């Protein structure tokens, strides 16, 4: 018991209260150096001599007031001006009103000396305020709802916004606008000690001034508060009855529907008092002036540019209160919004001239896009008409001839631009159908190019059979190149088997599947077999094999040297694969006279 008493006394005295306990010392470890700043051998932390191996600090159960280090949290808090806030006693309503009245007159003191014009204006405002106090309007009832919104906004603006030497806080009374300025810390301590800590919320980087404005046709008070110079903003509106009570009542800002106006903090409202469009100016307005002013304000909000955010709505029962929010906009800017619509109209007119070339380009492109299929459709229709006429003239031909040839050439006409390869049609016949073969091949080629109103190119191999192979090759190349470059899109080559063997290699250039010189053209080749007649019972595959074997005999033999300009079996196979896209037989026509086509 004695040891415990000594430890309790040790705890109560001096700095031992603040010593932080440490872990116990193990057995066999040396004692620590003195911790009390002395050179004595006293054990550290004032431990008992009977228990040197383990230190223990017993914390007392007594309340913290015993140690003398307890202070109320309210005293430790500092006011915004760095002064201790003393505890306030509860006062009666009349005493509170006196304190607030004194706070009001303390706020009314400005930091700078007013100019003569401003001093005269302040006198006018004071005279008007005294007249308002003797008006016969009944006293306003205090609002049953006390919102924290005003206190929160004012406190956040106090901490976030730097002070400005310009007076921005103004209160719009029933017929006048009064300014509320910075108040000393003594008058603000009352509200600080009673109110709850406000909630902080992020604000935009651009420092703005929030003003609460109420417009009323019945002459109600309009509260306009600015919190850049004061830590707590208390908006009071008073009205006295000349016959009854002279007591002052304080109305909370939540009784009105608030309207926030954000303006630049460095803007001085006294410079805008001369502008009739600014509603927060300091001169007196009659009720007749408020009505057109409100109408002009609504007009500005409706004609404002799209960049400004405007929110309409929330009118009171008498439609006198307008709730709006304009972001980062000074009063001078809002007064210039009336001219926004003509400027936008001229801007649209200027941009309209820039749109004309674009519209013209789109129109021409769409015309080209839609006209090209129309041209192709017309070319196909013209080809179909020509083929139907030929079918009526040459009635001795097999139906396969008309169906296959028409489908093949129509597909080529309908193919997309540029076309991948030319259309190669090979017609063959026996000796009895030589005239029909000539006439029909020429007329089919002309039908393909009938839309262009040009005649197909005609090359006859019988006229070149005895000429040199290289010469024939050069002549054929020139005839085809010149004709196809000049707008002709079809060519007919008669008696392909009569050409010199080496000269036929030129058709690699015009009949290739991928690398043809002209791909939007049609070539019609004819081969006359040595047989007297060609049976109608033969299939297309058999007819194709007959033509292939016949050309192989005509163009290759054992005496032909192997060279690049002479035909050989390998070159013939390559040529055949290019000209044999479609091989069709032609039957003789009894009504056809020699040398005259139908």
From Swiss-Prot:
The keyword Transmembrane applies. The modification Phosphothreonine is found at residue 221. Keywords: Coiled coil, Glycoprotein, Isopeptide bond, Membrane, Nucleus, Phosphoprotein, Transmembrane, Transmembrane helix, Ubl conjugation. One of its GO terms (biological process) is positive regulation of ATP-dependent activity. It is a single-pass membrane protein. InterPro entries: LAP1C-like_C_sf (IPR038599), TOIP1/2 (IPR008662), TOIP1/2_C (IPR046753), TOIP1/2_N (IPR046754). It comes from the Eukaryota. Pfam families: LAP1_C, LAP1_N. Residues 19-254, 267-314, 322-341 are annotated as: Disordered. The chain crosses the membrane at residues 352-372. Residues 205-214, 277-287, 300-313, 326-341 have a biased composition (Polar residues). There is a cross-link at residue 323 (Glycyl lysine isopeptide (Lys-Gly) (interchain with G-Cter in SUMO2)). The modification Phosphoserine is found at residues 60, 135, 143, 154, 156-157, 187, 216, 227, 230, 242, 320, 330. GO terms for molecular function: ATPase activator activity. Residues 1-351 are nuclear. Glycans are attached at residue 414. This is Torsin-1A-interacting protein 1.
């Amino acid at each position: 018991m004695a040891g415990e008493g000594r430890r309790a006394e040790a705890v109560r005295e001096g700095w031992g209260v603040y010593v932080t306990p440490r872990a116990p010392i193990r057995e066999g470890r040396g004692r620590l150096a003195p911790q009390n700043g002395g050179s004595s051998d006293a054990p550290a932390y004032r431990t008992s001599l009977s228990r040197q191996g383990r230190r223990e600090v017993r914390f007392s159960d007594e309340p913290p007031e015993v140690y003398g280090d307890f202070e109320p949290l309210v005293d430790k808090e500092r006011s915004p001006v760095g002064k201790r806030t003393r505890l306030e006693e509860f006062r009666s309503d009349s005493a509170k009103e006196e304190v607030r009245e004194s706070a009001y007159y303390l706020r009314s003191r400005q930091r700078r000396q007013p100019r003569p014009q401003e001093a005269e204006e302040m006198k006018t405002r004071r005279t008007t305020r005294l007249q308002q106090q003797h008006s016969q309007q009944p006293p306003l009832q205090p609002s049953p709802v006390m919102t924290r919104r005003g206190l929160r906004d004012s406190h956040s603006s106090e901490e976030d916004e730097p002070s400005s030497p310009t007076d921005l806080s103004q209160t719009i009374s029933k017929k006048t606008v009064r300014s509320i300025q910075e108040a000393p810390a003594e008058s603000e301590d009352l509200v600080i000690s009673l109110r709850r800590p406000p909630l902080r919320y992020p604000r935009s980087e651009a420092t703005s001034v929030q003003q609460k404005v109420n417009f009323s046709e019945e002459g109600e008070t309009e509260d306009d508060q600015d919190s850049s110079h004061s830590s707590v903003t208390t908006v009071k509106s008073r009205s006295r009855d000349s016959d009854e009570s002279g007591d002052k009542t304080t109305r909370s800002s939540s009784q009105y529907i608030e309207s926030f106006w954000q303006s630049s903090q460095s803007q001085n409202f006294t410079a805008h008092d001369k502008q009739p469009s600014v509603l927060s100016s300091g001169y007196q307005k009659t009720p007749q002036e408020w009505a057109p002013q409100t109408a002009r304000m609504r007009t500005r909000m409706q004609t404002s540019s799209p960049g400004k955010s405007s929110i309409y709505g929330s009118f009171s029962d008498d439609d006198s209160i307008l709730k709006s929010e304009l972001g980062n906009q000074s009063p001078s800017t809002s007064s210039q919004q009336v001219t926004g619509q003509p400027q936008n109209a001229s801007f649209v007119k200027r941009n309209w001239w820039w749109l004309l070339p674009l519209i013209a380009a789109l129109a021409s492109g769409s015309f080209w896009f839609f006209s090209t299929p129309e041209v192709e459709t017309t070319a196909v229709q013209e080809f179909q008409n020509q083929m139907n006429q030929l079918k009526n003239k040459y009635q001795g031909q097999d139906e396969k001839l008309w169906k296959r040839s028409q489908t093949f050439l129509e597909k080529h006409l309908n193919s997309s631009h540029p076309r991948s390869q030319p259309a190669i049609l090979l017609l063959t016949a026996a000796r009895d159908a030589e005239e029909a073969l000539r006439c029909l091949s020429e007329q089919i080629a002309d039908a393909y190019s009938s839309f262009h109103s040009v005649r197909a190119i005609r090359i006859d191999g019988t006229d070149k059979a005895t000429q040199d192979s290289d010469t024939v090759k050069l002549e054929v190349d020139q005839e085809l190149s010149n004709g196809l470059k000049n707008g002709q899109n079809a060519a007919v080559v008669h008696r392909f088997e009569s050409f010199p063997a080496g000269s036929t290699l030129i058709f690699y250039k015009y009949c290739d599947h991928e690398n043809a010189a002209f791909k939007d053209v049609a070539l019609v080749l004819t081969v006359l077999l040595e047989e007297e007649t060609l049976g109608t019972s033969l299939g297309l595959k058999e007819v194709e094999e007959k033509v292939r074997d016949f050309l192989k005999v005509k163009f290759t033999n054992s005496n032909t040297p192997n060279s690049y300009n002479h035909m050989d079996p390998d070159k013939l196979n390559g040529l055949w694969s290019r000209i044999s896209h479609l091989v069709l037989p032609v039957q003789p026509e009894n009504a056809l006279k020699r040398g005259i086509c139908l």
